């Protein structure tokens, strides 16, 4: 069944006002009277609804659905700005894998440089990708997408997390394999977790120092070296296995 995220709080009847949502519902999917869909408002509760007025885009809420697919913890993925469209892939797949937020920041060794206008345009594009992926994967929430203009702005957010993991290539090369598994075993429901990944060039020594000063732990992600767009997906899969599948 089709699922749509609706801005604002639940009301009955529901009038869809967002132009993109209206276009997709009634022009692309060609919904008509009595067709049923799932609507998700900002409270994250899924609700079964049916079309009562196609011309005016009106729905009647039928019932709340007991369907929560969110992880028991809040996971934020933060990547140094990578080249090309790699963030597009990370955003789509991280949303499918359960991330609550997808962030990116200008790392010391990031090759790309985005000014204010490009940054806003990129952020808007990624937000749309996250919305589409959240609808497809039947999420209860659309992940926050945030691109930091300055690294200092990102660093100021680190105090808001219960655990910070730094995916560090040199740690993986040294054969460190146990830290992530050990720490995930200690995680409690509702905690906020941050994973930090470098761009193609990796994380600089000064960045490692700053992240560790904020309480971050260096981790390896298995014995193999991954691309910057692969590592976040491995990390999210590890969290899902530890906290959802292995319970």
Predicted features and spans:
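N-terminal positively charged helical leader segments and presequences
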Residues: 1-67
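Mobile, glycine- and charge-enriched loop segments
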Residues: 37, 66-77, 184, 188-189
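Active-site/ligand-binding-proximal alpha/beta "capping" segment
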Residues: 164-202, 206-207, 216-219
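Structured adenosyl-cofactor binding patch, chiefly the S-adenosyl-L-methionine
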Residues: 204-247
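Generic structural signal for residues in well-ordered beta-strands
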Residues: 59, 142-146, 218
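Short, acidic/turn-prone active-site loops that include or flank metal/cofactor-
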Residues: 65, 171-172, 223-226
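RNA substrate-binding interface of SAM-dependent RNA methyltransferases
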Residues: 68-166
């Amino acid at each position: 069944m089709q699922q749509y995220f609706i801005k604002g709080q639940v009301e009955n009847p529901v009038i869809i006002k967002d132009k993109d949502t209206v276009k997709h519902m009634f022009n692309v999917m060609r919904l008509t009277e009595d067709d049923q869909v799932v609507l998700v408002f900002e409270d994250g509760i899924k609700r079964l609804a049916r079309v009562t007025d196609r011309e005016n885009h009106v729905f009647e809420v039928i019932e709340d659905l007991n369907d929560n697919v969110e992880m028991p913890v809040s996971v934020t993925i933060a990547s140094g700005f990578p080249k090309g469209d790699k963030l597009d892939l990370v955003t789509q797949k991280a949303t499918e894998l359960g991330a609550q937020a997808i962030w990116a920041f200008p790392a010391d060794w990031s090759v790309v440089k985005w000014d204010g206008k490009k940054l806003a345009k990129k952020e808007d594009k990624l937000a749309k990708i996250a919305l589409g992926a959240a609808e497809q994967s039947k999420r209860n929430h659309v992940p926050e997408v945030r691109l930091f203009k300055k690294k200092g702005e990102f660093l100021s957010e680190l105090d808001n997390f219960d655990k910070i993991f730094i995916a560090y290539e040199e740690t993986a090369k040294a054969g460190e394999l146990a830290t992530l598994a050990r720490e995930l075993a200690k995680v409690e429901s509702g905690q906020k977790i941050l994973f930090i990944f470098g761009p193609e060039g990796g994380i600089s020594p000064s960045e490692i120092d700053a992240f560790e000063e904020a309480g971050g732990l260096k981790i390896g992600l298995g014995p193999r070296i991954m691309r910057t767009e692969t590592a976040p997906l491995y990390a999210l899969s590890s969290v899902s296995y530890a906290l959802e599948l292995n319970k």
